[in-house]
Every structure is written in C-alpha cells, then in structure tokens.
Amino acid sequence: MTAMLRRNPALTREQFRHHWREVHGPWAMRNPEVFGFRHYVQLHAPTDADTNPLAKARQSPPAFDGVSEIYRNAPTASPEAVAALRAEFLEDEKYFLDIPASPVFMGEVRVIIG
C-alpha cells in the first residue's frame, strides 16, 4: 500500500512531520502482527517541496507532505482485534492528515532493478 499524504491544514509542515515520525509511526509498529505489517517506510517531503524547480517545470500540483509505503502479510490477529486497532489508527490519522486529499494505492509490486 502506498499513500500520498497531505497534512491536516491546521498543522504546520513541521508539526505534521513530528507527529508522523514520533507518534504515528512508532504507534503503528507497536503491534505490527495485528495488521500483518512487515515493512513500513515514511518518505518525508523536504521543507522546500513547494519550491522544487522540477515540480515547477512539470507544472505539478502542490507537493504532498509525505509518502507512506506499507508491505503486509495476512494479519494474524482476530478480525475484532484488527477492527479495533484500525479504528484507533483512523482517529490518529484524522488528527494529522487531510484524509480526503491523501490518496491510497493498492497494487502489485514489480521490482525492476534490485
């Protein structure tokens, strides 16, 4: 799963980065087996992402604040445990993300190099 993240407009980019890195990320990995997480990557946009010359040359839309990549196995917890943790997870995401502006992609990984 890959998510293109935009921060809650009530937060500064630094507040978003801090919460995602220091609160949400560690919280998500406390019980990785519940969701079946086996690999979790956070890509934090640079603070000057909105002035990136390549993005300007391509007439790109406003920069995302980050990208999340999660690779999963089948969850090992009960459906009830997964649902309960998912509800907690969503509450935290509502705090720091602009959820409607943060698209999520699910797909098949095809390694080209590496």
Task: Show the residue positions of the predicted features.
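Macromolecular interaction modules
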Residues: 1-114
